[in-house]
Amino acid sequence: KKALEKIKSILEKGGAEVIEVKDDRVNPSKEEILVLMYEFKIGLEKYLANSNSPYKTLKELIDYNEENKEKVLKHFDQSIFIESDKTSSKKSEYLRALDVVLDSRNQIDKLINENNVDALVGLSWSPAWEINHDGGDDEAIAKQRFWVNGGRAAMAGYPNVIVPLDLVDGLPIGMSFIGTAWEEKKLIQFAYAFEKINGFFPKPKM
């Protein structure tokens, strides 16, 4: 809450009118993951086909990892590889999911146009979480405060300019300026003005 209040205060200090935008739509994370898994296999195998690697398919990489698991799977499994390899038979599901994901463009456009705003702003990501070799990211994230913004912009292929905001729990967090297609120049101008007023440029502690 304090971070959001800081964003509002800086924006108003810079002459912006801040309008609260309500968006209660659920992020299509299930569809997003299916699209990611499906396209990951295609992209990886296209890369491997033109590389010097002796392995040309995702399945060959999975088999190699399994054969050498004591060395290469010491900390993490390869469940993402395995799930991605299963998507070859899911083209129709992929196409439906892709339609849902790409509809994020319409959702962002609608929020901007209906509320007559130049950009959508909000907190970007929560502080970085600790590496958990046993439980992975999910378990690590569960132990701390977590939020995320900008996923819909990523799915839409729309610009999302992130600038430093403040420290939370001793770790840096950022804020996002999200816009519609081809609005990069305007968003960068907003972000630059925000950074000048905020003046938050922490030096890392070694």
Which residue ranges define each predicted feature?
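Stable alpha-helical elements in mature extracytoplasmic
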Residues: 3-7, 40, 93, 104, ...
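Short helix-loop capping/hinge segments that flank enzyme active sites or metal/cofactor-binding pockets
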Residues: 38-104, 162-172
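Short glycine-rich anion-binding loops that position phosphate/pyrophosphate groups of nucleotides
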Residues: 50, 125-128
